[in-house]
């Protein structure tokens, strides 16, 4: 088994488990088993944002881990190419299922574009990256939204022409946690948290590690499985 940083797998596993939980709540609402505004309540909205933050933070940290010393182009295009293709497929499938509420620029789209931007930032030190993240966060706070703008700019920032979407993560502000992840690399390395291991965990954390290592696959298949499960339940009852 290749060496990995186990705590990152654990955090990613917790994040994907949280995402499945959130989507299960969405399905309960969608199929009429919960009140129609369930996931729009403040606590659920916060939960959703925490999940997105964690995925983007880990993605930024992983970019620095893999490419800080030198850019491994083969690894980069394999990882981010697959992510981008999956993002496009999700847009197509959600358009077929939900039409105008399709996912146009969701979490995978944000990770893909942030990865490209991140390549340009790899040589910045941690302090510079941190200040850039803070600047972008403040920019998002002080820019009045939605901005007057057309449909094309929805990938960058929320505009007056941005339609409804089941998952929407525009670059401003959602590149911020990605850059914070990049900025944290040197700090975590200083604290000795970047040590790799090929040790297999044989306790309750092993499931979380497995979920973390297979997070993209789980992300892609969990919602279809949940949907089919709900449809079968409705048919049987």
Please report, for each region that a protein language model flagged, where it lies by residue.
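Alpha-helical transmembrane segments and their immediate juxtamembrane cytosolic regions
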Residues: 1-237
């Amino acid at each position: 088994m290749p060496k990995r940083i186990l705590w990152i797998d654990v955090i990613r596993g917790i994040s994907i488990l949280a995402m499945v939980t959130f989507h299960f709540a969405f399905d309960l609402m969608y199929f009429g088993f919960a009140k129609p505004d369930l996931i729009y309540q403040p606590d659920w909205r916060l939960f959703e944002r925490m999940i997105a933050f964690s995925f983007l933070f880990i993605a930024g940290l992983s970019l620095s881990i893999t490419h800080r010393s030198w850019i491994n182009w083969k690894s980069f295009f394999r990882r981010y190419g697959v992510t981008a293709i999956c993002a496009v497929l999700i847009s197509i499938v959600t358009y077929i299922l939900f039409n105008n509420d399709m996912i146009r620029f969701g979490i995978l789209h944000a990770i893909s574009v942030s990865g490209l931007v991140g390549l340009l930032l790899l040589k910045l030190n941690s302090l510079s990256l941190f200040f850039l993240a803070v600047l972008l966060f403040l920019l998002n706070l002080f820019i009045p939204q939605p901005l007057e703008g057309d449909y094309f700019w929805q990938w960058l920032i929320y505009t007056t022409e941005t339609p409804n979407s089941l998952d929407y993560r525009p670059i401003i502000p959602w590149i911020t946690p990605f850059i914070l992840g990049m900025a944290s690399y040197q700090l975590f390395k200083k604290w000795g948290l970047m040590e790799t291991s090929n040790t297999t965990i044989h306790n309750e954390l092993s499931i979380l590690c497995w979920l973390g290592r297979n997070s993209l696959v789980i992300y892609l298949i969990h919602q279809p499985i949940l949907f089919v499960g709900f449809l079968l339940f409705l048919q049987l009852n």
